[in-house]
Amino acid sequence: MSKQLCEKMSKIYLLITHIWAVTNLETLEAIKGVTRSNYGAPLLLVVGCRPAEAWVRRYDGKNGAEVDAAIVATYLMLAAENEGLATLWVGSFDPALLRDILPCTEGYDLVAMINVGYPAPESTPSAMHSERKAVEELVTRVV
């Protein structure tokens, strides 16, 4: 990831977002009980946010913490992919169990876990990653 991108992210999004980089084998093994989405990646990034510190839209009170954390997570994934690494966003996990394993996450809403590593040569994405709706079903042109 470029230094400029890191600096930009830290100024904009990392005010309320935190990233935990997990590489300890025992901890990675323990985290397997938190989700079914485990693929043996040597690095797991856990992304969390603090809604109490986030920007809130004044019109309806919409809190931007999760959106900001998702932006950070997306940038992390794009940067890793740019370095030739594979990533997998995991949203299906039990935050309470993860917090038991990583007490340092206390006080944060846990948004995502991201597996990072080199892809296995035989790996292929599931159908849900290649099947697409027609553009007309996704985009409405307003004229």
What are these regions (language model features)?
Residues R36-L45, P103-P125:
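A glycine-rich helix N-cap at a beta->alpha junction
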Residues L97:
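Glycine-rich phosphate- or other oxyanion-binding loops that anchor nucleotides, phosphorylated ligands
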Residues V72-E81:
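Acidic, metal-associated active-site segment
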Residues G84:
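Structured binding elements
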Residues Y59, A112-V143:
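C-terminal helix-cap and adjacent tail motif
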Residues C49, S92, Y118:
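Short secondary-structure boundary segments
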Residues T87-G91:
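Short beta-strand segments at enzyme active-site cores
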Residues S2-V72:
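Glycine/small-residue-rich phosphate/adenosyl-binding loop
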